[in-house]
A protein has these predicted regions:
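Alpha-helical interface subdomain recognition
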Residues: 2-157
Length: 157
């Protein structure tokens, strides 16, 4: 059962990366189209921060998910990585979509664009298949067990 859950979690994380990418694209385009207080949103430093932070969230999520899928594909023990993406990716999606909503203003929470649905979906994923706290405990236990056995953690190459 855990193998099926693991593959499902990877699938949901890959889907979340795609949704983050879409929200990011919408946010950047909106910042280039929207004028506020005599200037375009894309000239504002807070928007630069939103773009940079979202870029990092998406890249980290994408790379963590790919790494996890590679471990699974090679038949390795991916339990810790599965728990890590289960915690990190939905939280990152929540942050990226929240920033996109901020850039869109009231339009961001309307049914006219998909951001409000993405926001709800991201929050729901943080509860599905066990809350974040359970997975954090599993990550810590797996890491500590390896160190207690005289090993260190291999983050890959």
């Amino acid at each position: 059962a855990q193998d099926r859950l693991g593959a499902g979690r990877v699938y949901h994380c890959m889907n979340s990366v795609g949704q983050m990418w879409r929200a990011f694209d919408m946010m950047v385009r909106r910042s280039m189209e929207r004028e506020v207080h005599g200037g375009m949103l894309d000239t504002k430093q807070f928007v630069h921060g939103f773009i940079a932070d979202s870029y990092m969230d998406i890249q980290a999520s994408r790379l963590m998910t790919i790494r996890c899928a590679e471990i699974m594909e090679q038949g390795g023990d991916a339990r810790t990585d599965i728990s890590a993406i289960k915690v990190f990716v939905p939280a990152a999606m929540h942050r990226v979509v929240d920033r996109a909503i901020q850039v869109h203003g009231a339009l961001g929470v309307s049914a006219e664009i998909p951001l409000e649905g993405m926001y709800r979906g991201a929050r729901t994923l943080r509860l599905a298949d066990g809350p974040d706290e359970v997975h954090r405990i599993l990550i810590a236990k797996n890491v500590l067990n390896r160190y207690r056995n005289g090993e260190s953690w291999d983050f890959g190459t």
